[in-house]
């Protein structure tokens, strides 16, 4: 449980930093920025899950690939399916992360469901968004809520293992 909480909090901080960069630099939503954002975010997630297996570098590499593929999938599918495809992509990255975490696919599915619901619940955090106010604290808490079910599912180990 401790690893799940630490992971969710760390990656929530990375996501909040990403929100700050997008807002603080007034970045327009361009494919190259989205690809970079997804790659860096999932590089961090992969590194964390990899570190739990003492394969940090490989986890980071796989995580970066997952993030790039996820962001690329979003940008390919969004013009056809709309922005709601973001929920679909978000859900399926957890199955890929199960591989990085060394977790069974079933736990990837549980992570997909739990974190998918969490992401759906927090998905309105950008509207309205006040980058000068307390919104970053709300973003951090919201991201923690969205990530925690996935981290719980993927980092849980039965007693004695």
Which sequence ranges carry the predicted segments?
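Juxtamembrane/disordered regions of integral membrane proteins
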Residues: 1-161
């Amino acid at each position: 449980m401790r690893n799940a909480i630490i992971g969710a909090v760390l990656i929530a901080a990375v996501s909040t930093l990403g929100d700050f960069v997008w807002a603080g630099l007034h970045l327009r939503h361009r494919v190259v920025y989205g690809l970079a954002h997804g790659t860096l975010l999932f590089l961090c997630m992969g590194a964390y899950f990899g570190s739990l297996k003492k394969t940090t570098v490989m986890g980071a590499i796989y995580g970066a690939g997952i993030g790039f593929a996820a962001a690329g999938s979003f940008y390919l599918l969004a013009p056809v399916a709309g922005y709601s495809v973001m929920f679909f992509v978000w859900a399926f990255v957890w199955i890929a992360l199960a591989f990085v975490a060394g977790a069974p696919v079933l736990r990837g599915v549980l992570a997909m469901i739990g974190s998918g619901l969490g992401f759906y619940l927090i998905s309105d955090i950008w509207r309205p968004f006040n980058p000068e106010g307390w919104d970053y604290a709300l973003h951090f808490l919201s991201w923690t809520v969205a990530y925690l079910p996935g981290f719980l599912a993927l980092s849980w180990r039965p007693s004695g293992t």
